[in-house]
């Protein structure tokens, strides 16, 4: 600690900004110099470990005291992870104080279910200093100003926001002229068509988990032509993604949608290099365009019908992956692992292409199959790929964890007996 004490204040503040705030405050016991240094650290990072109603006051008291005594001219970051019982009035006050301190990064998390929704202070909607805003809590946006003004905001994360109308969503995003990253998880709101119109947006994750929707003609409308990374997930039984625009700079896309126009989706994704799909089986006549840049494709096994269709349109494909995970509900903040279909939607038939796709002849090198069950349709797909992929180097198959040793041995014997057109192809089975 003596060596650190020799450093200039600015350097010490930088070091302390990487330390939890409780530890930072405790440094006031080290010496007279350290007694006041913590007050100038431009970051408050508090994570409340309590989940019981009788202890939430400890978090309120600590945060109140820190903000009251804090003397830095600018509060760079306010990061709060709070228990579900933290009073909404306290959170609203802390947000207001942070805005008055010209906060740049405002990250508020509250465990759900909570004691009640939060009404964001109106001053937040015109905070021009914000660069990143994370609101992972149950909050309502209904008393918003006519215009939002987030001139500096580059990253916006909204989980479980309750917007009162389509118009408020439009006004919010139009007030973010330099927005680059957006994450949305919808649970229940009053928005019919959630329009994401953001010309500067480069990264988007949009997830619809609503159980009830106001009508049938609802969903996301995405107008973001500069996207480089796109993730769309729909677990709602009644809504879908209404429309997309062409995204010529798209590099990575993951689409898991129970309802929607497959033709519309595929035609807008042709520039991507990495693609993951979990969609309704396509119609034979579905035009999808040519994926000239695609090198990695991940298909959910509920969508095996896409395999035959898309292989004919991916001349440079090098990696092909199959998987389906639906046995349990993954945590909401990690829904990318979850199949959007029910068990009855798993495809049981597959027809091989009428002619061998170009990628199987010249580019496909790796095939992976996660949670292989040994079903007849799975064996047919594996057999076709082994018998026709001339450049294939690796076929890696991982069985379900619940598969017993006898079943694994039988699967391995069946797979090993399949003829491989590429003699250098290695078969890995676990």
Swiss-Prot record:
Q: Which SMART domains match?
A: FBD, FBOX
Q: Where is the FBD domain?
A: 349-399
Q: Which domain of life is it from?
A: Eukaryota
Q: Locate the F-box domain: which residues?
A: 1-49
Read off the SUPFAM superfamilies from this record. Answer: F-box domain, RNI-like
The record's section on CDD domains has: F-box_AtFBL13-like (cd22160)
PANTHER family linked to this entry: EMB|CAB62440.1-RELATED, F-BOX/RNI SUPERFAMILY PROTEIN-RELATED
- What's the protein here called? Putative FBD-associated F-box protein At5g56440
Identify the taxonomic lineage of the organism of origin: Eukaryota, Viridiplantae, Streptophyta, Embryophyta, Tracheophyta
